[in-house]
Structure formats: structure tokens, C-alpha cells
Amino acid sequence: MKYLFSLFIVCSINAANIDTFFAALGKVESSNNPRAINKKEYALGIYQIRAAYFKDSKIGGKHESVYDAAIAKKVCLAYFAKYEPQALKNNDFETLARLHNGGCGWRKNKSATDSYWKKIKKNL
């Protein structure tokens, strides 16, 4: 019984932490506007998801579905699980932020995501 209670607490803490990360991500990307559009990059929704990112997540449907914040979160989680599963499991928000901003090749030029990570970190 103690084990189940401990597991529940750990799972609750992890869920709260990922929610905190997504709150910071939304604030930095769109000022928490689920209808935001970056016309230059055609990045949509609260997390400013580009078409290639959406397609790469493999959740299916249309890119425009990311205007729904719940779907946008699902897209991000699928993308994170695909490219940085250990970071997602460990709540390594620095790695997840850099992946979100720099794409799956972000490690080739880590410094390109430095300022982005600082913005996310400030909002955590």
C-alpha cells in the first residue's frame, strides 16, 4: 500500500511539472494564445507548431487542429517521445525546450537554442 501511495505522489508531481513546462512554453511561444499564427513560418497555436513538426509527430489529422491546445500538447508530447524519450521521462525541460525550438537536430548547434532556453527557464 505504501508503494502505491508513493507511486501516486511521484506521478502527480511529474504531471504537475510537465504542466508547468507547457505553461512556460505557451507563454514564450504565443503569450498563451491558442489561435496565434506566425505567418512567416506558418507556426500555429499556443505552442507555435510548424507543419513539419506536426507531420513528424504522427498523430494524424490536419495541422490546423493545433489551434486546440489539448491537441497541440499531444503533438508536442509525441514529438518529444520520438526524439528525446529519456528527457521526457526525466522532466528534462532544457532538452525538451531546445528540441521544440531547434528541431530534432538541435544538438548539432546547441548554442542556437540558448536564448530560447533562457526564456523558458525564466517562466518555469
Residue map of PLM features:
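Short N-terminal segments immediately surrounding and downstream of signal-peptide cleavage
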Residues: 17-35
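Structural recognition of the beta-strand scaffold that forms the well-ordered cores
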Residues: 24, 46-48, 98-99
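Short N-proximal segments of mature Sec-exported proteins
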Residues: 29, 37-55
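Sec-dependent N-terminal signal peptides
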Residues: 3-13
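Extracellular/periplasmic catalytic domains that process cell-envelope and extracellular macromolecules
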Residues: 16-18, 40, 89-93
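Alpha-helical segment that forms one wall of the substrate-binding/catalytic cleft
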Residues: 51, 55-107, 117-124
